[in-house]
């Protein structure tokens, strides 16, 4: 009997799929299934079907997360910050801010995404480990210490920062917190000023923006 005829002759209520090898006493005929792409055998004695599907390799795809912050302030300073993180790797931050005075400006991630009182209500630097202020490459630093960005003669600052302390998920996620660009250069905790180990003595807050997730 043809294989498709054999299958049709078996009541659907008696069809069973199983993995073990068939008994030697059963008669078999090959049947190709498009579902598995593997040969099936149909067993007339037990009206059962055994599939010998080979193991399939599993491909793990990295989970990409993206976020954005739009910076606004009372001055003419504004900008956009985008963040991308692949799986649990470091976060890549792309910064573009206009309206700055030429030179260095402190750039930090602050604890709160609260801008009800302008940039003042964003709180202190994001500091889950309760450390003192430092440079981005220092072991002792705030997680939100991202150093300085440099504005050109036209007041434009563009930078790419890669950092492993500002993830987009988990207990220390930066989503809902705020980026702030400052008036002055950040002394990276080494200026000897009374504010060096807290703010880097970076001066006033020119513009800020809350981090929010975006479609990938």
From Swiss-Prot:
Entries under InterPro entries matching the protein: SOD-like_Cu/Zn_dom_sf, SOD_Cu/Zn_/chaperone, SOD_Cu/Zn_BS, SOD_Cu_Zn_dom
Enzyme class of the recorded protein, top EC level: oxidoreductase
Residues holding Cu cation: 108, 110, 125, 182
Similarity comment: family membership: Belongs to the Cu-Zn superoxide dismutase family.
Gene: SODCP
Record's protein name: Superoxide dismutase [Cu-Zn], chloroplastic
Highest taxon of source: Eukaryota
Cofactor binding, note field: Binds 1 copper ion per subunit.
Quaternary structure and partners: Homotetramer.
Transit peptide interval: 1-62
Disulfide bond residue pairs: 119-208
Key words of the record: Antioxidant, Chloroplast, Copper, Disulfide bond, Metal-binding, Oxidoreductase, Plastid, Transit peptide, Zinc
Residues the entry annotates as binding Zn(2+): 125, 133, 142, 145
Pfam families named among the record's database cross-references: Sod_Cu (PF00080)
One annotated Gene Ontology cellular component of this protein: chloroplast
A GO molecular-function descriptor: copper ion binding
